[in-house]
Regions:
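Short, amphipathic alpha-helical "recognition" segments used to contact nucleic acids or chromatin
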Residues: 29-45
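Recognition helices and adjacent regulatory flanks at domain boundaries
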Residues: 11, 51, 78-82
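Short basic/hydrophobic patches in alpha-helices and adjacent helix-turn junctions
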Residues: 38-43, 52, 68-71
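Short, Lys/Arg-enriched anionic-surface-contact patches
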Residues: 2, 6-33
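Amphipathic alpha-helical interaction segments
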Residues: 18, 44-47, 73-76
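Intrinsically disordered, low-complexity basic tails/linkers immediately adjacent to helix-turn-helix/homeobox/MYB/SANT
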Residues: 68-105
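Short, basic interhelical loop/turn and adjoining N-cap
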Residues: 46-48, 52-65
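Non-catalytic, well-ordered alpha-helical scaffold segments
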Residues: 5, 34-35, 60-63
Length: 105
């Protein structure tokens, strides 16, 4: 069973690598909020204060964060379909394809 602490630990690593504090006006806030809710729902936990973990500072950070989230999805394939739909929306909003991420990050 994945614990809330593990989810927070993984997300905190994302935060240090690519996320910044932000408000609900930040780019792709809805998708990021949904991703947290998806993980929490799947593992039976409630993630609170999601807004503190939501910001992406710039486009390069978006690419890095999506790459890291992809790695997390690979570890937990149970959430893959729904999470990939969210990532695709992030991808579209960033104006990039996954093939371009390697050169962008």
């Amino acid at each position: 069973m994945v614990t809330l602490e593990l989810i927070y630990g993984v997300m905190t690593d994302f935060y240090h690598q690519a996320f910044r504090l932000s408000t609900s006006r930040s780019p792709m806030f809805a998708e990021k909020k949904q991703m947290f809710a998806l993980l929490a729902r799947h593992y039976g936990h409630r993630v609170v204060d999601i807004r503190d973990y939501m910001g992406w500072r710039n486009h390069g950070s978006v690419c890095a964060a999506v790459r890291r989230m992809q790695g997390f999805i690979d570890v937990y394939p149970e959430v893959q379909r729904e999470a990939m739909e969210l990532l695709n929306r992030v991808d579209e909003a960033a104006g990039q394809t996954y093939l371009e991420f390697d050169s962008a990050v």
